[in-house]
Amino acid sequence: MLKKIPNILTIGRIIIVPFFVIAFYLPGFYGDLTAFALFVIASFTDFLDGMLARMMGEESKLGELLDPIADKIIVAAALILLVMSGTIKHYEVIAAIIILTREILISGLREFLAKGQIKLPVSNLAKLKTFLQMFAISLLLTGETGNKILNFQDYNAQTIGIILLWLSAFLTLYTGYEYLRKGIDHAISEDEKN
């Protein structure tokens, strides 16, 4: 199982996390650049591992288990670091909490449904949410370096990142509600059978 390329990419994404955390605390340009690069690599492998698994016919139970865990670890680490550093602050923290809460709830829901052999397929809207979330976090990780490079009048990398974070938080609420509704419908139908 570990020899399968998609699984190696997924495990690599988990291994990146401690290096990402260390890079986040490196000062200045190189710290910003390294943390940004590691997060972008992790985000890209999230897209790549699933695509390769389907293309190569290498979908596996291990990949199915580890992929969502790897996603949540890197996103949670990034959001927590961005809040702790003050990059995400004040009311913006609500967006981060919405994203983290949804991830925990949906993980629990998927586990519950898996017991009944029910899978929740990922919707296109959820894929868009993930893309916006990763893009927002990537921009926020660029720090002052990103603000100097990406600056359109009143909109710099941080401002655009916060706007995209809120947009992904709203999509998070919507897609989370959709998944929760499907899960509740399934639970009710199972109760009625018994």
Predicted regions and their residues:
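Residue-level signature of the transmembrane alpha-helical core
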Residues: 14, 37-40, 69, 97-100, ...
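Active-site His/Glu-centered metal-binding helix of metallohydrolases
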Residues: 15, 44-52, 69, 73, ...
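C-terminal membrane-associated helical module and adjoining short loops/tails
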Residues: 1-7, 17, 27, 35-43, ...
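Hydrophobic alpha-helical transmembrane segments of integral membrane proteins
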Residues: 2-3, 11-15, 64-67
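Residue-level signal for threonine
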Residues: 10, 60, 123
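Membrane-water interface of transmembrane alpha-helices
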Residues: 104-112
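Membrane-embedded alpha-helical segments that form the functional core of polytopic membrane enzymes
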Residues: 16-65, 78-98, 156-171
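Core segments of transmembrane alpha-helices
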Residues: 12-17, 70-79, 106-107, 129-141
